[in-house]
Amino acid sequence: AYCLTEPDSGSDANSGKTRAVLSEDGKFWKITGQKMWITNGGFADVFTVFAKIDDDKNLSAFIVEKSFGGISLNPEEHKMGIKGSSTRQVFFNDCKVPVENLLSERQNGFKIAVNILNLGRIKLAGAANGGSKMVCSTSVKYANERQQFGRPISKYGAIRYKLGEMATRTFACESAI
């Protein structure tokens, strides 16, 4: 699960308050903080967690396994859609993470986070375009079957215009992806 968003950080993801402190023996990081709206948080055994180290300007990224302990979850969020995934708040309370689980370099986490978000946006655009194609196809089929005043509604200019607009916008969306 991807653990970036925090209360009070919203769009300014780099301002998160979750902290990672190196243990005295230098063998592990202790992560403390709260993440919210974590997709698949209830199912995940592994978390990508973004946290600040000391007074660093940028986030660092860590691979955190649920088995490390110090992790607790709030109940499921009640959502209007996307019911197939678990969305929860995740709390890290002195979660001990081995030093080798620092992902990439220190302060490179924000760059990693943004790259993950950008990939997600591209995938979402593809899914939305697929939905648009299905709606166009279904609309054309319906317009050809639905009769009004003795002929299919697809023969009327207003319906043709609407179907043409749908097809044009869907093609434009696909071309932009």
What are these regions (language model features)?
Residues 9-12, 38-39, 70-71, 99, ...:
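Flexible loop/turn segments at secondary-structure boundaries
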Residues 14-16, 45, 69, 159:
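Short beta-strand or tight-loop elements
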Residues 8-11, 37-40, 52-53, 79-86:
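Short Gly/Pro-enriched turn/cap motifs at secondary-structure boundaries
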Residues 1-5:
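A short, Trp-centered hydrophobic/proline-enriched beta-strand micro-motif
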Residues 27-73:
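A short core secondary-structure module
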Residues 13-15, 42-44, 56-57, 85-90, ...:
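Short, solvent-exposed loop/turn segments at the edges of secondary structure
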Residues 72-174:
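Glycine-rich beta->alpha junctions and the first turn(s) of the following alpha-helix
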Residues 18-21:
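A structural signal for short hydrophobic beta-strand segments in well-ordered beta-sheet cores
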